[in-house]
From Swiss-Prot:
Recorded name of the encoding gene: gatB
Function of the protein: Allows the formation of correctly charged Asn-tRNA(Asn) or Gln-tRNA(Gln) through the transamidation of misacylated Asp-tRNA(Asn) or Glu-tRNA(Gln) in organisms which lack either or both of asparaginyl-tRNA or glutaminyl-tRNA synthetases. The reaction takes place in the presence of glutamine and ATP through an activated phospho-Asp-tRNA(Asn) or phospho-Glu-tRNA(Gln).
Protein name: Aspartyl/glutamyl-tRNA(Asn/Gln) amidotransferase subunit B
Reaction catalyzed: L-glutamyl-tRNA(Gln) + L-glutamine + ATP + H2O = L-glutaminyl-tRNA(Gln) + L-glutamate + ADP + phosphate + H(+); L-aspartyl-tRNA(Asn) + L-glutamine + ATP + H2O = L-asparaginyl-tRNA(Asn) + L-glutamate + ADP + phosphate + 2 H(+)
UniProt cross-references to NCBIfam families, sorted A to Z: gatB, PRK05477.1-2, PRK05477.1-4, PRK05477.1-5
Organism field: Pelagibacter ubique (strain HTCC1062)
GO biological process: glutaminyl-tRNAGln biosynthesis via transamidation; translation
InterPro entries: Asn/Gln-tRNA_amidoTrfase_suB/E (IPR017959), Asn/Gln-tRNA_Trfase_suB/E_cat (IPR006075), Asn/Gln_amidotransferase (IPR018027), Asn/Gln_tRNA_amidoTrase-B-like (IPR003789), GatB (IPR004413), GatB_C_1 (IPR042114), GatB_Yqey_C_2 (IPR023168), Gln-tRNA_amidoTrfase_suB_CS (IPR017958)
Amino acid sequence: MTKDNSEYLIERRDNVYEVVIGLEVHAQVTSNSKLFSSSSTTFGAEPNTQVSLVDAAFPGMLPVINEYCVKQAIKTGIGLRAQINKRSVFDRKNYFYADLPQGYQISQFKYPIVGEGTVILDMAHGQKEVGIERLHLEQDAGKSIHDMDPQNTLVDLNRSGVALMEIVSKPDMRTPDEVSAYIKKLRSIMRYLGTCDGNMQEGSLRADVNISVRIKGSDKLGTRCEIKNVNSIKFMQMAIDYEANRQVDLIEDGKTIDQETRLFDTKKNETRSMRSKEDAHDYRYFPDPDLLPLEVTDEFIEKLKADIPELPDDKKKRFIDEFKVSAYEATILVSDIETAKYFEEVVAKMGKNKDMKLAVNWITGELFAVLNNKNLEISESPVSAKNLAKLINLIKNGTISGKIAKTIFELMIDGDIDPQIIVEEKGLKQESDPKALEALIDKIIDTNREKAIEYKNGKEKLFGFFVGQAMKVSGGKANPQLINEILKKKLQ
């Protein structure tokens, strides 16, 4: 098997196979109420406490479209550079399951609210474009709970009727890394827009992964299998790896691949068959007679476009142009809207004498390390942007060294303490007086005369020894730049 950032190939005997991947992402719409009822969508509520008569499919109850959910879907479509359809139709998708009280799901089949679009991925080997086939609105089902009662399956209808956007990609992805980048980019766009929170651990973003394999260089698509409801990027990558190899092994053994729906077992790290894959006619789609076609005007769409915030790709370009950061650094900074906000606040608080390199390094290095260690989001950062900017300025103006700054940063974490106060209380101000440093270096050279002679005779590696001695004697407070300059003069 060949794996790198640009290709993912499976080698068997005389054949080399490539993997073809498409995703159907189910994104829960950020909305206070459901798609066709006024019931709350609050996560974590007690079972069956957020269920209206419409959600429970009581006879005679009619759905009423939530305009806000429609706006959220259109905004997402705009963010995906997609065609917004001024006329869309809600259909009934007919199937039976215990947590689907209507006996059908209200979805969109032939006429979705959003058409084709694109998502640009920043990969290590360059940019990759993934096509969007469509985005349609649909209602979520309830939740079946199998592990609370040994004899029965329990049903919680709190989720029933919650608005979902199903975002269907084209089969343009070829590697697990591209799938990871696609999910992250999609989540980032929706978080910028405020249309989906993207919290996979809460189930508000999950995906069906469609996989097929074919001989490298072939244009013909293989038989695809769908892996249902994968709710983490790590599991998606593991599922793709297992399923692709399973399909290749079947082909190499002369067997056929069945078109089917499969489940990823997270304990065994393997996929297993659930049922044969349904085609559209199996669901007997037809327009919902209780809902008129949804029609929106150009004016309605333009008004939503005017409210679209700066999105990741545009923000990345601005960061590169305005702040002179690298494309790689900009990609990291804009990938999460809260990180981008934090960075811009740090830059604003740094004042006129800005050092962008220091700002980027401290945010993506020291701060990210603390957040990862404490399992915190940047919005929960124990160090405010204001105080991090102060710390960076103290380094920039020579008040403290980078080494001392790391010590101060560790102290700042406990209570978001002003770094200037720490410097004053702990006596950590950097020694930058040339005369004082000359006297210190003269003493070090005098104490180590033999090494000074060796250095002058060509043993240049000893320069680091003298720098180390200067930092040791000064308690780490000596200005490293001045130490280097003075030592070079003294040791000539």
